[in-house]
């Protein structure tokens, strides 16, 4: 008795040790910095809200984003992928539950003998059940792996949604900027045409020469050449915006509003450590890592014995004649069984599967670390862009004011005969370039704010992220309906 109890306890301890070893060592995530390097001093720690695009104060933009959220075809495919992942998770979850089957049959028997004719009705009903004892956690790990993939699929959908909404905002701003650049280009053509009239009038009275006339005609043609290019770019931007809304571009129109009428929302980055709970792509990477870790547990457990319990019972018509009674007898029956199987030789298939699962876990661990680094870089780049654009704001305003003043002065002096033609031509080129550059600066500023909102997660949060670390949040993530 003593030896038997000792062996039993040793066996249990050994099984527990093996069960612990199946988990393996969890990869360590990189430690984020204490603060973002490019974050402005004394900035608030308010993260973007889920309706961050309202901050631009554009009703048309709000309507376009709402349309994209409901009609974007990529998002529709992503929602279908979520449904598929949920279905696979339900299939995997079924492996940890018993399976029960029911069956039945009925036969009509008739015959003749020396005693006359006879007939009987034979019927039977059977209920069977089987259950694999998940002693090593293989089935549970398989179910967990599928559940984490379903969680990752949801986060993938949210990442795509954030990318789509940011793309709508960027394309909308691009359309507005191209319209303004077209207006500036047409204004430049008109200014070049007016200057050509001045040069022609001076040439007719002998105050100008043919070279100046030809030069200005070339400048006018060059200015007109810009317009078709900008019109094509505008049409492409509108088409790109229509695609994001899931609509054909032929009938899609943008009402538009001046860029200067748009509000620039105040967006601040919080702590880098909080960023990891606010980026759906990082959440996806960690969920994939957890799935790979669970798959590795299942692959290791497959090397150990499996125990399957079976039970079946039924009832057969007890009124049959003895001549037609089978060996199983009549009336209620009950069968109980257990099967123990240990893989012995499979050509190395199970060990190769374990090696594959281990390599997959290593890949997902590297992908998780890469997602964290990429998230931090995205925020730093967006903050850096805004910082440099803020520094250039004053110079842009000064450049615009001085170039317009220089062009108007040079044009008047030339018209009055006090200035030379080359000064006017150079001033005209400069003022157009500065006006066009100023519009592109406004566009860059708006798109940098969009990029920062996107880099900060766009108001997304991991489930229960405010109360627990991300790994725990993964455990608490909404599960598929079983």
Feature roles, as predicted:
Residues 4-13:
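Sec-dependent signal peptide recognition
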Residues 9, 21, 263, 416, ...:
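Acidic, low-complexity, intrinsically disordered peripheral segments
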Residues 17-19:
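C-terminal motif of bacterial Sec signal peptides marking the signal peptidase cleavage site
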Residues 21-88, 260-290, 343-344, 369-372, ...:
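Bacterial Sec-pathway N-terminal export signals of envelope proteins
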Residues 47-56, 105-128, 142, 251-268, ...:
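Small/polar, glycine/serine/threonine/aspartate-rich low-complexity segments that form flexible
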Residues 65, 124-128, 172, 217, ...:
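Membrane-embedded beta-strand positions in outer-membrane beta-barrel channels/transporters
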Residues 76-77, 93-94, 133-161, 211, ...:
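Sec/SRP-type N-terminal targeting helices
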Residues 139, 155-271, 385, 389, ...:
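Periplasmic alpha-helical coiled-coil/stalk elements that build and connect Gram-negative outer-membrane
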């Amino acid at each position: 008795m003593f030896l038997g109890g000792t062996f039993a306890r040793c066996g249990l301890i050994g099984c527990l040790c093996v069960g612990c070893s199946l988990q393996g060592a969890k990869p360590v995530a990189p430690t984020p910095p204490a603060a973002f390097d490019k974050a402005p001093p004394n900035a608030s720690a308010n993260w973007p809200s889920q309706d961050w695009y309202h901050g631009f104060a554009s009703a048309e933009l709000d309507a376009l984003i709402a349309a994209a959220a409901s009609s974007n075809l990529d998002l529709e495919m992503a929602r279908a992928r979520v449904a598929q992942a949920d279905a696979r998770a339900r299939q995997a979850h079924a492996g940890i539950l018993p399976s029960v089957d029911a069956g039945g049959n009925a036969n009509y028997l008739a015959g003749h003998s020396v005693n006359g004719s006879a007939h009987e009705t034979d019927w039977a009903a059977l209920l069977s059940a089987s259950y694999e004892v998940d002693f090593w956690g293989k089935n549970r790990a398989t179910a967990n792996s599928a559940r984490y993939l379903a969680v990752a699929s949801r986060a993938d959908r949210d990442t795509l949604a954030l990318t789509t909404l940011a793309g709508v905002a960027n394309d909308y701003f691009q359309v507005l900027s191209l319209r303004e650049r077209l207006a500036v280009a047409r204004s430049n053509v008109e200014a070049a045409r007016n200057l050509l009239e001045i040069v022609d009038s001076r040439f007719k009275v002998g105050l100008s020469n043919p070279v100046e006339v030809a030069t200005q005609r070339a400048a006018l043609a060059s200015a007109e050449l810009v317009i078709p290019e900008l019109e094509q770019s505008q049409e492409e931007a509108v088409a790109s915006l229509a695609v994001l809304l899931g609509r054909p571009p032929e009938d899609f129109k943008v009402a538009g509003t001046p860029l200067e009428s748009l509000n620039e929302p105040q967006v601040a980055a919080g702590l880098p450590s909080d960023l990891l709970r606010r980026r759906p792509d990082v959440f996806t990477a960690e969920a994939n890592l957890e799935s790979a870790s669970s798959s590795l547990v299942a692959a290791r457990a497959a090397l150990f014995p499996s125990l399957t319990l079976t039970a079946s019972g039924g009832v057969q018509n007890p009124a049959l004649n003895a001549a037609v009674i089978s060996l199983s007898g009549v009336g209620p029956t009950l069968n109980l069984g257990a099967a123990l199987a240990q893989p012995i030789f499979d050509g190395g298939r199970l060990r190769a599967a374990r090696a594959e699962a281990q390599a997959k876990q290593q890949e997902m661990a590297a992908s998780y670390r890469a997602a964290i680094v990429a998230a931090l870089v995205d925020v730093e780049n967006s903050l850096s862009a805004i910082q440099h654009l803020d520094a250039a704001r004053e110079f842009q305003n000064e450049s615009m004011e001085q170039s317009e003043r220089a062009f108007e002065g040079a044009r008047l002096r030339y018209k009055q005969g006090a200035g030379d033609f080359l000064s006017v031509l150079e001033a005209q080129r400069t003022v157009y370039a500065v006006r066009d550059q100023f519009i592109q600066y406004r566009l860059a500023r708006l798109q940098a704010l969009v990029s920062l909102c996107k880099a900060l997660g766009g108001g997304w949060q991991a489930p229960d992220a405010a109360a627990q670390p991300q790994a725990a949040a993964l455990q608490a993530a909404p599960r598929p309906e079983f």
